[in-house]
Amino acid sequence: LTPNDPLYSQQWGLSGTYGIRANTAWDNGYQGQGKIIAVVDTGITDHPDLLANRTSPLGYDFI
């Protein structure tokens, strides 16, 4: 997979020293079909609309 985003080189979270090395996954054939990914930050632990829909214990890191 070749990223077509003109700002890809600035997205350190994908490919930089501290990134997830997405290009390595893409080179190995992982492209994300059939996967749902969410990044959820602070502020959800006591949000009334989300309390009933949490599927993991607080503080759990999926990665």
From Swiss-Prot:
Keyword terms of this UniProt record: Hydrolase, Protease, Secreted, Serine protease
Domain Peptidase S8 residues, every copy: 11-63
Domain of life: Bacteria
GO molecular function: serine-type endopeptidase activity
EC number annotated for this UniProt entry: 3.4.21.-
Annotated compartments: Secreted
GO cellular component: extracellular region
Gene3D superfamilies from the UniProt entry: Peptidase S8/S53 domain (3.40.50.200)
Entry's Gene Ontology BP terms: proteolysis
Subunit field text: Heterodimer of a large and a small chain.
Similarity annotation: Belongs to the peptidase S8 family.
Protein name: Protease 2 small chain
Organism, as annotated: Achromobacter lyticus
